[in-house]
From Swiss-Prot:
Name recorded for this polypeptide: Large ribosomal subunit protein uL22
Alphabetized InterPro entries for the sequence: Ribosomal_uL22, Ribosomal_uL22_bac/chlpt-type, Ribosomal_uL22_bac/org-type, Ribosomal_uL22_CS, Ribosomal_uL22_sf
Gene3D superfamilies, per database record: Ribosomal protein L22/L17 (3.90.470.10)
Segments passing through the bilayer: none
Taxonomic source organism: Thermosynechococcus vestitus (strain NIES-2133 / IAM M-273 / BP-1)
CDD domains the UniProt entry points to: Ribosomal_L22
PROSITE patterns with a match to the protein in the record: RIBOSOMAL_L22 (PS00464)
Keyword flag RNA-binding: yes
Record keywords: Ribonucleoprotein, Ribosomal protein, RNA-binding, rRNA-binding
């Protein structure tokens, strides 16, 4: 369990060229896991979203180590979410002079880590 008064370290990746729905699919499986378990899970998941999420998770752990002096072995993912970013708009030419709009979504990935409680509450 993660205590509410414990220090947390965050990391964000902005304007990632990926749909937030596809990123949330991975983040939902990581929320509440330990840092090491999350890294192992990300390594073997078959999704493209795992690469940027791994980078953000490592950055959050580095922030916790450098800024707060926490041990990475005790870290738990307290928050993990993906917000929608701006859509890049492109146009595909179609018949008779028409054009269809193609939206290329982006997202902002945020992960926060906190030290794990020593007293586990069931």
């Amino acid at each position: 369990m993660v205590s509410t008064s414990s220090p947390t370290a965050r990391a964000c990746a902005k304007y990632v060229r990926m749909s937030p729905h596809k990123v949330r699919r991975v983040l939902d499986q990581l929320r509440g896991r330990t840092y090491r378990d999350a890294l192992i899970m990300l390594r073997f998941m078959p999704y493209r979203a795992c690469e940027p999420i791994t980078k953000v998770l490592r950055s959050a752990a580095a922030n916790a180590t450098h800024n707060l002096g926490l041990d990475p072995a005790t870290l738990v993912i307290s928050q993990a979410y993906a917000d929608q970013g701006p859509c890049l708009k492109r146009f595909r030419p179609r018949a008779q002079g028409r054009a269809y709009q193609i939206r290329k979504p982006t997202c902002h990935i945020t992960i926060a880590v906190a030290p794990q409680n020593t007293a586990d509450e069931s």
